[in-house]
Amino acid sequence: MSMSDPIADMLTRIRNGQIAGHSNVVMPSSKVKVAVAKVLTGEGYVSSYSVSDKNGKSELSVDLKYFEGQPVIEMLKRVSRPGLRVYKNKDELPKVIGGLGVAVVSTSKGIMSDRDARKAGIGGEIICYIA
């Protein structure tokens, strides 16, 4: 089965895993998914991530984070998708929930948070919002 939007699949697996109370979720790995997981870990939304090789297939395992039994991630929303790409320059980068959330941005310097993109003075494709 081909997957038209693997990033949306990753975000859905994380969202569903937290709703179900799982400690971690496993999914097929790619460079983009690992970069998004790195941003999620750096911003404190997930505990950690790891990439392993099973039967010749690379798998990404994301360890979910909870605070007092509640998921740390309250909102996880895909913005730019294959049918409608969303690009913003450095001055138009959004502040998610007034700066309390994070926008994951794909830039020419790699995938990073909106704060890092503002510091670097570059814009790019808005992958998702997290709060």
Curated annotation (Swiss-Prot):
Keywords: Ribonucleoprotein, Ribosomal protein, RNA-binding, rRNA-binding. One of its GO terms (molecular function) is rRNA binding. It comes from the Bacteria. The keyword Glycosyltransferase does not apply. It holds the Pfam family Ribosomal_S8. One of its GO terms (biological process) is translation. Part of the 30S ribosomal subunit. Contacts proteins S5 and S12. One of the primary rRNA binding proteins, it binds directly to 16S rRNA central domain where it helps coordinate assembly of the platform of the 30S subunit. This is Small ribosomal subunit protein uS8. It comes from Hydrogenovibrio crunogenus (strain DSM 25203 / XCL-2).
